[in-house]
């Protein structure tokens, strides 16, 4: 793939001490080129913000503007990978390779659903979890 110039701008930058991260909106200018990969963005952000571990960087919700050449999304840089594992949703951890997805069999899903059908109200969630172990 041809390495064309890519410009990364961050705006609405804020440090969130409560969640021990930096959060911002990313604007990527990539004229004459298809979308920039998230791995490449993480690598460039790690160099920009001098992050030791690129696994602590999360980029998501990218939308390409009409006509191409510009994309916008969100970025999070956690202080440590441990804090990222603590605060990030599981699906984002799986996408970034920090967690593994548990594949449930079709039969397990159906059995759990049928157990839950027999019970009403608040006890429904407990019934699904009890037999799961």
UniProtKB/Swiss-Prot annotation:
It comes from Arabidopsis thaliana (Mouse-ear cress). Transmembrane segments: none annotated. Residues 104-133 are annotated as: Disordered. GO terms for molecular function: mRNA binding; structural constituent of ribosome. Belongs to the eukaryotic ribosomal protein eS24 family. The keyword Ribonucleoprotein applies. PANTHER family: 40S RIBOSOMAL PROTEIN S24. It holds the Pfam family Ribosomal_S24e. Keywords: Ribonucleoprotein, Ribosomal protein. GO terms for biological process: translation. Residues 109-125 have a biased composition (Basic residues). SUPFAM superfamilies: Ribosomal proteins S24e, L23 and L15e (SSF54189). It comes from the Eukaryota. This is Small ribosomal subunit protein eS24z. GO terms for cellular component: chloroplast; cytosol; cytosolic ribosome; cytosolic small ribosomal subunit; nucleolus; plant-type vacuole.
